[in-house]
């Protein structure tokens, strides 16, 4: 197909979260067991959640909708009134390396995995200081929204792991903006940088 689809979750099921609720953020039950055994890939909450991603890709494929890539979390610093879940960049990288990539490799080894998928304020520190080279090897790229934080954070992030793909996955016209303002950011500032650096997607 001419369009590559990236899937991005808002929240794990409530029973997998420390809060027990879908909405207003909350964290995955990191380091805990579901009670069915002690196999990390099948009995930890992280392993169980990773297999939800695989099942989603399978079911979408049955509907004729091929999933090209996934992000670990949509807006992981956001805790709105609707379903959401909080992650640090480090937690995303660890989950991708230890659970999501191994789970995907069983059935979808070509699946692209992206981290961040949030505004650039999450990228104030060098990504290499947060994500280890081993973790980076399980990640295909980093995606951003352009609501908060300087755009230079995004540009600088590409220096840590230049082999990654970089893209923008969300932007809307803010209350104090015109459509032309938003277009300038998407196609002008971010879009031009992506093209100059050989990147190929704005979603």
What are the roles of these predicted feature ranges?
Residues 2-4, 63-69, 108-112, 137-140, ...:
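Loop/turn elements at helix/coil->beta-strand transitions in domains of secreted/extracellular proteins
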Residues 141-203:
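Catalytic-core region of carbohydrate-active enzymes that cleave or remodel glycosidic bonds
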Residues 1-132, 147:
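Substrate-binding cleft and catalytic face of glycoside hydrolase catalytic domains
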């Amino acid at each position: 197909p001419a369009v590559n689809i990236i899937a991005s979750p808002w929240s794990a099921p409530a029973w997998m979260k420390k809060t027990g609720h879908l909405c207003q953020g909350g964290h995955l039950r990191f380091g805990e067991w579901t009670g069915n055994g002690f196999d990390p890939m099948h009995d930890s909450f992280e392993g169980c959640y990773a297999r939800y991603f695989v099942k989603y890709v399978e079911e979408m494929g049955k509907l004729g909708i091929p999933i090209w890539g996934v992000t670990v979390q949509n807006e992981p610093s956001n805790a709105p009134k609707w379903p959401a879940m909080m992650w640090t960049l480090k937690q995303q990288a660890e989950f991708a390396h230890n659970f999501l990539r191994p789970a995907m490799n069983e059935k979808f080894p070509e699946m692209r995995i992206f981290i961040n998928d949030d505004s650039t304020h999450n990228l104030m520190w060098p990504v290499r200081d947060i994500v280890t080279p081993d973790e980076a090897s399980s990640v295909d790229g980093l995606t951003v929204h352009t609501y908060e934080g300087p755009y230079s954070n995004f540009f600088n992030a590409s220096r840590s792991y230049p082999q990654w793909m970089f893209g923008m996955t969300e932007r809307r016209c803010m209350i104090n903006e015109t459509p032309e303002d938003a277009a300038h950011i998407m196609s002008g500032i971010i879009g031009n940088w992506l093209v100059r650096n050989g990147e190929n997607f704005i979603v």
